[in-house]
Amino acid sequence: PPEPTTDPSFFRDDFTGALKPQWNWIREDPKNWSLTAIPGSLQINVGGGYVTANTNFNMLLRPAPTGNFRIETQLSFSPEDNFQFAGLIIYESPADFIQAGRGYCRSSDCAGEGLYMNYYKKGVAVKPDFGQAYKDSKPIALRLSREGENYTFEASTDGKVWFLVGSHTSGIDPIQVGLVAGQRLKGGTLPAAFDYFEIRSLP
């Protein structure tokens, strides 16, 4: 378990038993999320739809702390086709948000299966997406930090040594934070498993 903290913004859900209070499902599809399929993890089956179009299901949000903060999770997910995605989100509205996680993009300027950071401003994707090829099927830890108007995405294979994926400058109002999965265009059920979700304040 994490060390005791005096951080007033600290929050952690290890997804054992029931979801902790203050979580809010956006377009919940109860048949496609589970806390029992993989005990100790939240499994969300990646469906179609996009945040920007208000068509994705089972986006899980909670109030963001004020000031600077970092959100973190550990994700098991192996995307295999366009444009499957699962990861963290800092959210103002369907038009203004930042999502960071594992995804798949097969085109000339994409990294294929990899790590991506997508910033949407007024409904339009802001380049770059910092795509880095990543094909390991092992769980990967992800964290997304807000420091003023700087948003930074880092990842780690062991939860100790973190590497930078990318960073964007944004004036969004980070009202909510949480987990997101979607953008599957075709194919069958594709599970994404989140081992925990954590919030910490930053100086």
Where are these regions (language model features)?
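Extracellular glycan-recognition regions
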Residues: 1-203
